[in-house]
């Protein structure tokens, strides 16, 4: 059973699955799919080619799937894809992709607090937290389990690694490595995110290896190339250190230090 308020506008062609609740004055466009258990509170607008997964809660005055703000965008049939079990709070804006990636994508279990902006072609993993007024510019990639403090803008094409935590009112213009704490304008590294790693169930051995890797990368004065070679040699069997090394090697914007 679908629960749709009498004042909501659902255009012909929209696919609304059982268990969806759509509140007062919502607008759902003709190319939208909303899967079971998702709740749209009041005044939510969902347009464009948009798919919203199961059991999401979308609060008042959220806008999803509208045309992006890229001046090169000419109305291409790009998409917005949202997974399951996300909480999207008041006044969040999530724009559709461009012909670069063809989609903006959000994973599962994320908390996106009020007034966050998710621009075109952004990719967000799972179980991330975005505090109020975070701004993700176009093409930003946020790996799973990251936490971004409030009022933080992130430059286009920047990547944020898993299990990292960025302090509030920071400004991010380079990639932020996984597993670290970072803060400042512009952002600098403040150490390993040890409390966060413990809360996520990392073992003492895993944390110890990441501490050693952090020291080799950022505290011993080595050239980055030499530090990476040392990590590959000494931690070849450690999946977390391998992810860290691969992250740095794949960086296009350079890494924050």
Swiss-Prot record:
The EC number(s) this enzyme carries: 2.3.1.129
EC category name: transferase
Summarizing the function annotation, the protein's role is: Involved in the biosynthesis of lipid A, a phosphorylated glycolipid that anchors the lipopolysaccharide to the outer membrane of the cell.
Give the family, as the similarity comment puts it: Belongs to the transferase hexapeptide repeat family. LpxA subfamily.
Relate the assembly described in the record: Homotrimer.
Coiled-coil intervals = none
Q: What are the GO MF terms of this UniProt record?
A: acyl-[acyl-carrier-protein]-UDP-N-acetylglucosamine O-acyltransferase activity
Respond yes or no to whether keyword Lipid biosynthesis is given for this record.
Answer: yes
Q: Name one GO biological process term.
A: lipid A biosynthetic process
Reactions performed catalytically: a (3R)-hydroxyacyl-[ACP] + UDP-N-acetyl-alpha-D-glucosamine = a UDP-3-O-[(3R)-3-hydroxyacyl]-N-acetyl-alpha-D-glucosamine + holo-[ACP]
What NCBIfam families does the entry give? lipid_A_lpxA (TIGR01852), PRK05289.1 (NF003657)
Q: Can you say what this protein is called? A: Acyl-[acyl-carrier-protein]--UDP-N-acetylglucosamine O-acyltransferase
This protein's record includes keyword Cytoplasm:
yes
According to its UniProt record, where is this protein located? Cytoplasm
Name the UniProt key words of this record, in alphabetical order.
Answer: Acyltransferase, Cytoplasm, Lipid A biosynthesis, Lipid biosynthesis, Lipid metabolism, Repeat, Transferase
Can you list the GO cellular component terms from the UniProt entry? cytoplasm; membrane
User: What pathway does this protein act in?
Assistant: Glycolipid biosynthesis; lipid IV(A) biosynthesis; lipid IV(A) from (3R)-3-hydroxytetradecanoyl-[acyl-carrier-protein] and UDP-N-acetyl-alpha-D-glucosamine: step 1/6
